[in-house]
């Protein structure tokens, strides 16, 4: 069993936005400036060519800073207040509204030969897919996981395992699911 895990980045989500006459300029530590343009333009009802994003240094994002919800908040506030706005989330809000690494339940079974080399590996798992965030909750990949998710961890195993099988069952996401970038396969 793997529990939900929050990113808890060194710095909480923060953004500065300045809205002027149908355009907005953003300064934010983001891992995905294109998503900033898409999300902010949709939130403000403007063309994404009118969203300028300056990427600042970020104190560890681990995948969390690829989701621009905090940036859209700053842009909306700037438009409503008619002046530049800086939004800094509290640590409590950062944890509460994170895109969590998915909870997972797994069963694993392996076999080794007389020399201790792995000969077989069976892995059964159930986890909410990242597809629930990107493709929407009704997409098939949101329930069963996408192929790339099932392959993570299999592509760089340091052993030649002649017999391996990975099975995945459905699991619904009850919170926002997101990438949790880290060392190795997490």
PLM regions: where:
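Gly/Pro-rich active-site capping loops and adjacent beta-alpha segments
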Residues: 35-41, 46, 93-185
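Short secondary-structure boundary/capping elements
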Residues: 5-9, 69
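Alpha-helical support elements that line or immediately flank enzyme active sites
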Residues: 15-81, 138-152, 181-186
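Short glycine-rich loop/turn motifs
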Residues: 11-15, 105
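Beta-strand segments within the central parallel beta-sheet cores of soluble alpha/beta enzyme folds
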Residues: 26, 49-56, 83-92, 119-124, ...
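Short glycine/proline-enriched turns and hinge-like loops at secondary-structure junctions
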Residues: 8-10, 100-101
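Short Pro/Gly-enriched beta-strand edge/turn motifs at strand-loop
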Residues: 1-5, 87-94, 141
């Amino acid at each position: 069993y793997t529990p939900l895990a929050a990113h808890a980045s060194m710095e909480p989500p923060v953004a500065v936005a300045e809205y002027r006459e149908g355009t907005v300029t953003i300064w934010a530590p983001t891992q995905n400036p294109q998503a900033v343009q898409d999300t902010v333009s949709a939130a403000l009802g403007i063309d994404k060519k009118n969203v300028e994003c300056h990427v600042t240094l970020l104190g560890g994002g681990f995948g969390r800073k690829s989701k621009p919800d905090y940036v859209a908040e700053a842009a909306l506030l700037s438009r409503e207040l008619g002046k530049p706005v800086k939004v800094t989330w509290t640590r409590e809000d950062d944890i509460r509204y994170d895109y969590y690494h998915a909870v997972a339940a797994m069963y694993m079974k392996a076999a080794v030969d007389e020399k201790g080399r792995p000969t077989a590996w069976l892995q059964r798992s159930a986890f909410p897919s990242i597809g629930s965030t990107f493709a929407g909750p009704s997409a098939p990949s949101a329930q069963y996981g996408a192929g790339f998710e099932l392959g993570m961890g299999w592509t760089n195993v340091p052993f030649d395992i002649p017999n391996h099988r990975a099975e995945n069952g459905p699991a619904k996401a009850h919170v926002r699911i997101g990438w949790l970038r880290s060392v190795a396969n997490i």
